[in-house]
Amino acid sequence: MTSIRIGNGYDIHRLVSDRPLILGGVNIPHELGLLGHSDADVLTHAIMDALLGALSLGDIGHYFPPGDPQWAGADSLKLLAQVHQLVQERGWQVGNIDSVIVAERPKLKPHLAAMRDRLSAVLKVKPDQIGIKATTNEKLGPEGREEGICAYAVAVLVSVA
């Protein structure tokens, strides 16, 4: 019998000027970017938390503390690679990931395939094992007021042992 684990993740960051907007490792043209200690890639952060949560390994703040200068401006895809290594070392592999990005603007549909390609390359899975959807918050809440962008992710891990 195959063992599986499921984890979920969430992240939100504030939109500010003079920062790049990076989602799923893709630089998205926009006048605002996300504020954070690293590159503030909320999608990748939510996926990392989902992977860690599936194995009861805590959250990304435990491994990459926001007050630690070594993570300042860090490329979240490199952090994801480290989390993926933890998953593999424990005898698990990614079955699939499903995620949602909540942003009023910019329109993200043109960038979803590139995000899927970047994430699947890091996680060593086929692109069709990574689901990414984008939606608005219908002008409600911080995302709807364009104060921030958030992402939700669910990860299914399959035992390779």
From Swiss-Prot:
SUPFAM superfamilies, alphabetized: IpsF-like (SSF69765)
Q: Which residues does the record give as a divalent metal cation binding sites?
A: 11, 13, 45
Cofactors? a divalent metal cation
Q: Cite the cofactor comment.
A: Binds 1 divalent metal cation per subunit.
Which residues does 4-CDP-2-C-methyl-D-erythritol 2-phosphate bind?
A: 11-13, 37-38, 59-61, 135-138, 145
Family matches, as InterPro entries: MECDP_synthase, MECDP_synthase_CS, MECDP_synthase_sf
**What residues does the record give for site: Transition state stabilizer?**
37, 136
Pathway the protein takes part in: Isoprenoid biosynthesis; isopentenyl diphosphate biosynthesis via DXP pathway; isopentenyl diphosphate from 1-deoxy-D-xylulose 5-phosphate: step 4/6
Alphabetic keyword roster: Isoprene biosynthesis, Lyase, Metal-binding
User: Which is one GO molecular function term here?
Assistant: 2-C-methyl-D-erythritol 2,4-cyclodiphosphate synthase activity
Q: Which Pfam families match?
A: YgbB (PF02542)
Catalytic activity reported:
4-CDP-2-C-methyl-D-erythritol 2-phosphate = 2-C-methyl-D-erythritol 2,4-cyclic diphosphate + CMP
Q: A biological process (GO) annotation for this entry?
A: terpenoid biosynthetic process
Name the domain of life this protein comes from: Bacteria
**PROSITE patterns referenced in this protein's UniProt entry, alphabetically:** ISPF
In the Enzyme Commission scheme, what number(s) does this protein have?
4.6.1.12
Q: Which residues form a coiled coil?
A: none
Q: How does it assemble?
A: Homotrimer.
**What does it do?**
Involved in the biosynthesis of isopentenyl diphosphate (IPP) and dimethylallyl diphosphate (DMAPP), two major building blocks of isoprenoid compounds. Catalyzes the conversion of 4-diphosphocytidyl-2-C-methyl-D-erythritol 2-phosphate (CDP-ME2P) to 2-C-methyl-D-erythritol 2,4-cyclodiphosphate (ME-CPP) with a corresponding release of cytidine 5-monophosphate (CMP).
Family to which the UniProt record says this protein belongs: Belongs to the IspF family.
* Protein name from the UniProt record: 2-C-methyl-D-erythritol 2,4-cyclodiphosphate synthase
